[in-house]
Amino acid sequence: MPGRLMPLARSYAYRGYTRLPHDRVNAWRERASGRASVAAFQRVLGSGPVEIGGGLLKGALLDTRALTLTHVQAFGLVRGALEPSVQEALRRHVAPRATVYDVGANIGFFSLLAARLAGPDGAVESFEPLPAAAAGLRRHVALNDARTVSVHEVAVGAHGGRAQLMAVQEESWSHLAERGRHPDTQGVLDVEIVTIDELVAGGMRPPGVVKIDVEGAEIDVLDGMAETIRAHSPVIICELHGSNAEFLARTSAIGYVAQNLDGPEPIAEAGGIHALALRAG
């Protein structure tokens, strides 16, 4: 199929697979015939990119080397339905020509969305310390000709230096070793850590929006951008991993108001959620 027809066809195939009953699919995959069929299906889908079928990033291309039929986020990515509350928050707060920092960018879904929203005069600084995810991020930047996205293969924290990163089979759950060992940990990587304050002081364009998804290290990221917050008041969109009370305390102390993006439940009483924090007034 010429042009974009084949990526679109692969996208429909992925989405069709997700409509099958989950329990039956799992039982089928356990059988030898099912495993062989899944492997064959994966080879077809992996033969080239797929087109995102909906949402704010509809029409963008995904590299299927970053996806498998068992990838926990694969179907949300292909449907364009990944973390809709975060997508909507970016839509509301990323204006044309904005600068967005994507901290914990993974393979780049939100970096691409931020680039689309900010337009050709915007800038997206994407931070991803895990080599495999950073490679997927670079492929997505190239595949979509996202020239305003810059990829930084580093972690972001409270202090510059180096630290150990627990690499987990499901890449989106990898985290700094000081946060504890995940049961699916496959290895430990030595990574560079930078702070947002250091980057801005060194000449990087200051952010108007900072999106944070760092599997428990979100308070460290905030501590490392205290001066940037004071000087530039960026909008903060953050996934919380048990740090709800501390996030509220930190944002309140710097004159921000935080709200739960995922529902009406107060942040302090919620579990793992996405939060939005804005300068009060």
What is each PLM-predicted segment?
Residues 131-132, 186-191, 237-242:
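Acceptor-substrate binding/catalytic loop of class I
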Residues 114, 137, 141, 165, ...:
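Hydrophobic packing residues within well-ordered alpha-helices of enzyme cores
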Residues 105-107, 131, 156-158, 214-216, ...:
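Short, glycine/acidic-enriched loop or turn micro-motifs at the edges of active sites
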Residues 142-144, 166-172, 248-257:
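Short, hinge-like loop/turn segments at secondary-structure boundaries
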Residues 198-281:
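Conserved acidic-Pro-Pro-aromatic motif
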Residues 57-88, 147-148, 152-205:
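Glycine-rich adenosyl-binding loop in Rossmann-like folds that engage adenosine-containing cofactors
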Residues 1-140, 144, 203, 269-281:
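S-adenosyl-L-methionine
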